[in-house]
Amino acid sequence: MNSAGPKCVTLITGANTGLGFETAKALFARPEPYHILVGCRGQISRAEDAIEELQHLFPGTASTAQPLLIDISSDKSIALAFAEVQEEFGYLDIVVNNAGADLDTAVSSGRLTKREAWNQTWDVNVTGTQLFTETFAPLLLASKTQLPRLIFITSGLSSITEHANGSSPRYALAPAGWPKPDTLFLAYRSSKSGLNMIAAEWARVLRNDGVKVFNISPGFLDTGLGDDRASAERREKRALGAIDASVGGEFCANVVEGKLDEQSWPSKALRKNTVQPW
């Protein structure tokens, strides 16, 4: 069994792009040393390319990284990744549940049927996240740090309270009659509401083990959650007012560092400067 020495061993799913990559960048910029497992699905070269970019951006960093092939929608992939991490390290200090899917637009483009889009979105954002966490949780309990952390990534669109209050024009009542106007991002929004319950439950389950559990809402970021069409998706999000993903990466890195530890219990969804209503 190998060890990363004094470095904080941190696994970030979906870390080759988007918020996951921006979180890795933010950690590489810190003076504290991290050893980051750059999780990616598909081809391991995606993680290797991301690591090469990290090393290019931060040549003097004390942190290191290695690729980890993991697709949280696959039980086999989760099991293989767990076996790899368990054999090489035997523990984890930080887990960031970043991998996610937003496939609502795939319906309007004709790539997926509604059922396919809903099933795949929930499979990643809810089922996959739960099964991945369930598998890797024992490694957090074996952490070499005093305060292991488990982080979930929710969305501002997941708040049922804000939906009920009509706090956004998107929640305005629909006109009478049929057909109704399209409901935007409902598969994604509802899946993140489901994720909120998972995060709250893990906070309860791990409370007496000393694992700090966070559920963070990083804001509307110009990330690509869908697939290899991410660049076009990012352009569309910017046009709608999305902020740079690096802002979310800094927020997540602050949580990793422990700057929001006092907010870990009772369970809540954390925005950058406030608590997000359930």
Swiss-Prot record:
Phenotypic effect of disruption: Abolishes the production of eupenifeldin.
Record-listed NADP(+) binding positions: L19, D71, N98, Y188, K192, T223
Catalytic residues, chain numbering: S155, Y188, K192
Summary of the protein's practical applications: Eupenifeldin is a bistropolone-humulene meroterpenoid first discovered as an antitumor and anti-leukemia agent. This metabolite also shows anthelmintic activity against the parasitic worm Hemonchus contortus, anti-malarial activity as well as antifungal activity.
GO molecular function, one term: oxidoreductase activity, acting on NAD(P)H, oxygen as acceptor
PANTHER family found in the cross-reference section: BENZIL REDUCTASE, BENZIL REDUCTASE ((S)-BENZOIN FORMING) IRC24
SUPFAM superfamilies: NAD(P)-binding Rossmann-fold domains
Domain of life from the UniProt record: Eukaryota
Top-level class of the enzyme under EC nomenclature: oxidoreductase
UniProt keyword list: NADP, Oxidoreductase
Any one Gene Ontology BP term: terpenoid biosynthetic process
EC number: 1.1.1.-
InterPro entries listed in its UniProt record: NAD(P)-bd_dom_sf (IPR036291), SDR_fam (IPR002347)
Lineage, uppermost ranks: Eukaryota, Fungi, Dikarya, Ascomycota, Pezizomycotina
UniProt pathway annotation: Secondary metabolite biosynthesis; terpenoid biosynthesis
Segments forming a coiled coil: none
Similarity comment text for this entry: Belongs to the short-chain dehydrogenases/reductases (SDR) family.
Protein name as catalogued: Short-chain dehydrogenase/reductase eupG
Pfam family for this entry, one: adh_short
Function field: Short-chain dehydrogenase/reductase; part of the gene cluster that mediates the biosynthesis of eupenifeldin, a bistropolone meroterpenoid that acts as an antitumor agent. The first step of eupenifeldin biosynthesis is the biosynthesis of 3-methylorcinaldehyde performed by the non-reducing polyketide synthase eupA. Oxidative dearomatization of 3-methylorcinaldehyde likely catalyzed by the FAD-dependent monooxygenase eupB is followed by oxidative ring expansion by the 2-oxoglutarate-dependent dioxygenase eupC to provide the first tropolone metabolite, tropolone stipitaldehyde.
